[in-house]
Amino acid sequence: QLAPWRHRTNAGIYVQSVRIARIQIEHATAATYPNADSLTLEWGGSARALNRPVLLDPRASWHTVNSGSFVSADNVQEPDVYAVLPRAWLAHGVLRGVRTTAFDPTNTNQRDDPAAMRAIANWPGTQEAERALKNNFYTAINEDDARVTAGNQAPYKTVAEPWLYDRAATMFVLYSRSGSFKALREAVRATDFYADRVNATGHFSLAAGDTKYAYNESMAYSYWLTGDATLLPAISRVVDAQQGFSHVWSPQLGFWTERHTAFKLLANVVAYEVTGSSTLRDRVTTILADLRRHQDGANGQVPTPRIDGGLYHTGEQHGDWGPELGASPWMSVLVTDAIVRAYGSGEDAATAQFLLRMGRYMNSSLVLDPEDPYGTGAPALASLYATLLNGGDAFGEGGQEEHSLEVAAHIAWGYYFSDLLGAPEPALRQRALDLYETYDAGVNFWIRPTAPASGLAAYRVSPPRKWGWEHRTADAMAFALGLNAPAPTLFTSGFE
């Protein structure tokens, strides 16, 4: 067993569950790539007939990547053989700890024809986002179209920017919903590239010293899916790097953002899930309490009246507006993503209430943008970049349509937790759906079927980090809204 379903307050769950198990067998493969052998794993029946005398080091059967997204000089390693799991099983949430919805069967693993996608204005449910997650993945790995020039490709080998919001973890999100071998392979490769550049202090060497680039989420997934234990030290070093950021807000701090706070919490949550460390367990609980205190007004340091739910701080601390107190709805998404994950190891009402209040705050940030950036013929519903205590526009640039998907997904979590707490707020659900319509229009707007003739990607992703900010945290929207089926209680009795 590599990991049970850990719980910060109910130790009994440790002995009642298995989250990740490493299984080694000897198997002579009959198929060669791109074909695959199909194996069935069963438990609870007859005892196995064979035992391996010792577990082998998974890295003993890896090789240097020499084609595609990396070449030999990049020194990226990958397994000789991948175990690809069914998407219906992966969608139960074994990786990210929350249930998602598997891709519709019509959404194949191949890149869709851009002209065909541009011609379809709307898809049922959240299928527009699912198609975009997949199609924009090909842009992210520079496989949109062979005619895209080097200057218009994502510079992920030399520049930090494409890695912001965790490029590799977003690939694992795609894998967990699609079951795509290509997504899994690129995720493992990207993780190996990233892990090789986690320096001695736990920072990403392409952005040394900047904790908003310090992640361990993808390394946890690669460890769980391949058994590669060489990632464990780097997972811990990222936690050490994040300790350099002070998440407890006060007016005296020179710097504070929701983004940095979120990645600190997430690093500790992920490392706790991997290691079970009591120090990490207690730190996660402490950070959650500190954030609740901040949301409650930071012991009177945030004045009233104010729109409830936001994590208010000054624009000078944030770096984007003046001395006034404000909060960022779209950066708050990063916080709620980490807290939803932390909820899985605590299941406490206080954390659920935090998420409900944050969903209400995000909802309060929505405005109608008269500029109609996607050419729909009507004002677009969008969240502000940052809001003041009274809900006003702190940044002064109006609605931010490019952040519609992730904000909609986390207003959806607000609805989910209102239901979990016994007082559903259907207005939150509807607002999430309304905001999703803005995102839906934007997907089509940025598909440019003829662009490759000019050296540009047909599926435009600009800046490259956009793929991560939209999709890494938005994978559970359909589940949270109960679009595919009535949403079951989160984390009840593990995953049955």
Q: Where do the language-model regions lie?
A:
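Low-complexity, intrinsically disordered/propeptide-like segments
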Residues: 5, 59, 314, 493-494
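Catalytic cores of extracellular degradative/oxidative enzymes
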Residues: 56-486
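Short acidic, low-complexity intrinsically disordered linear motifs used
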Residues: 488-496
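Alpha-mannosidase-like glycoside hydrolase catalytic domains involved in N-glycan trimming
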Residues: 1-55
